[in-house]
Design a protein with these regions (language model features):
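Glycine-rich FAD pyrophosphate-binding loop
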Residues: 1-12
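Conserved flavin/dinucleotide-binding core of flavoenzymes
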Residues: 10, 65-69, 284-287, 300-433
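Short glycine/proline- and charge-enriched loop/turn segments
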Residues: 10-18, 256, 383-384
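Dinucleotide-binding Rossmann-like beta1-alpha1 core, especially the glycine-rich loop
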Residues: 12-94
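Local beta-strand N-terminus motif with an aromatic residue
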Residues: 38-39, 235-236, 363
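Short, P/G- and charge-enriched loop/turn segments at secondary-structure junctions
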Residues: 41-42, 258-263, 388-389
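Active-site/ligand-binding neighborhood in enzyme catalytic cores
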Residues: 49-51, 60, 70-72, 81-218, ...
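Mid-domain catalytic core of redox enzymes
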Residues: 209-335, 343, 352-356
Length: 433
């Protein structure tokens, strides 16, 4: 899902980190293929939004240390230079467990402060989840593999796994040269699915809208019957990008073992509140800040949209921030059956913006979206669920490919790559082969 809304008063919605690696180049190639190069708004490596990220701890915004100098000196809220945590990490033995929670892994290798402040906040910002429950192997596979392969996170990340073949385009070369850290599109991220729709339909691809799938059944010839309420269609192969728990309800009885594995992949809800202020200024310049669970159980973090993309501030321009609400606070509200009103989320977001950023005046505009069960949670042992699903699909030779956020990455970047790999696998597999 890409949520973005472009209004005269400004663009509200997603922006994507442009992190180094294969997924970056695959995504850059897609943007070029869709003819969107001229619409890209990059954040270059020397921009404040690329260099500055903050933690909100004890009522204070602290800049996360960057560069060697930042690692060598004390950087509150950490009591000691992070250099010592890195040095300590080099001496730690390799873990022996097949999986481990993010908190346990970080505490064992980097110490309690990094675990309870940095990794706790990171898990809330990326997964809206609890670092004491999420799997290091599935949520941060590069860290897990670094320890397994090189006995050290730092050594593993420094030595890397070698360079893989990378696509090339003028946009990708520009991104490399300018060290892009994130990007958006001039008309908002909604331009991406819109351009993809145009690209596909112009090539004869049928896109069905407003027709939810009500069931999947296997026919005697090995093809799928896809039920769509009052109608149906037949398919040689199905690529499913719906949440795993949703797919588990659609599968036929013959796929009960697969359905059981998928049903256990749960997801959490997140409320996203976009606020715009006239004549306001931020106390700091950067990408935004994260909030550890010990500080505020409701607020996951706040993104400073106007710092990265002032081009989208609208006319007349106004300061835009995005407040993300969730975590244990929202889970308790859902469990208790409380009324989850827009007023509740707006009040909570405005209070956070006032307390954490000093934005005490009422916003000129506010948009509230509650995304139910939108971010899958890769709990301890998630990798075993994927292995079980993969083994069942192979053994039964089902013409079904799993893709999307439920499996190996929740970011838009991960989902794009997941879809690409699913298409490659489906095209290389003959029906009933």
């Amino acid at each position: 899902m890409v949520l973005s809304l472009n209004l005269d008063r400004g663009e509200f919605g997603r922006r994507e980190p442009w992190e180094p690696g294969h997924y970056l180049w695959a995504r850059g190639e897609q943007v070029s293929e869709l003819g969107l190069d001229s619409e890209v708004l990059p954040v270059k490596g020397d921009h404040p939004a690329a260099q500055n990220r903050f933690l909100y701890v004890g009522g204070v915004l602290y800049a996360l240390p960057t560069g060697l100098r930042g690692l060598l000196r004390p950087s509150p809220p950490f009591s000691k230079p992070l250099f010592w945590a890195g040095l300590r990490e080099l001496t730690k033995p390799r873990g022996k467990e097949a999986d481990e929670t993010v908190h346990s892994f970080a505490q064992r290798r980097l110490g309690p402060e990094v675990a309870s402040l940095a990794m706790d906040s990171l898990c809330r910002g990326v997964f809206a989840g609890n670092s004491r429950e999420l799997s290091i192997r599935s949520c941060f596979p590069s860290l897990f593999q670094a320890e397994q392969t090189h006995r050290s996170i730092l050594l593993g990340l420094l030595l890397g796994a070698g360079r893989s073949p990378q696509p090339d385009s003028a946009l990708i070369r520009q991104a490399r040269a300018e060290r892009w850290s994130q990007w958006s599109l001039r008309g908002g991220m909604e331009m991406l699915p819109q351009a993809l729709d145009t690209y596909l339909t112009s090539r004869g691809v049928s896109v069905l809208r407003g027709q939810p799938v009500s069931g999947l059944s296997l026919q005697t010839d090995g093809r799928w019957k896809v039920s769509l309420g009052d109608s149906s269609l037949e398919a040689d192969h199905v690529i499913s990008a719906v949440p795993a728990s949703v797919l588990s309800e659609l599968l036929p009885a013959e796929a009960a073992p697969l359905a059981h594995a998928l049903k256990t992949i749960t997801a959490v809800s997140v409320a996203v509140v976009n606020l715009q202020y006239r004549g306001a200024r931020l106390p700091v310049q950067g990408f935004g800040h994260l909030v550890p669970s010990s500080e505020d159980p409701a607020v996951l973090g706040i993104v400073y949209d106007s710092v990265a993309f002032p081009e989208q501030d609208g006319s007349p321009p106004g300061l835009r921030v995005t407040v993300m609400l969730g975590g244990s606070w929202l889970q308790m509200l859902e469990a208790s059956g409380s009324v989850l009103s827009q007023e509740l989320f707006q009040e909570q977001a405005q209070a956070a913006a006032a307390t954490q950023l000093g934005l005490k005046e009422p916003p000129s505009h506010c948009l509230v979206h509650l995304h139910k069960n939108c971010i899958p949670q890769y709990m301890l042992g998630h990798w075993q669920k994927l292995e079980s699903a993969s083994q069942f699909l192979a053994a039964q030779r089902l013409p079904l490919t799993l893709a999307g956020a439920s499996y190996e990455g929740v970011a838009v970047n991960d989902c794009i790559e997941s879809g690409r790999q699913a298409a490659v696998r489906a095209l290389s597999t003959e029906p009933n082969s």
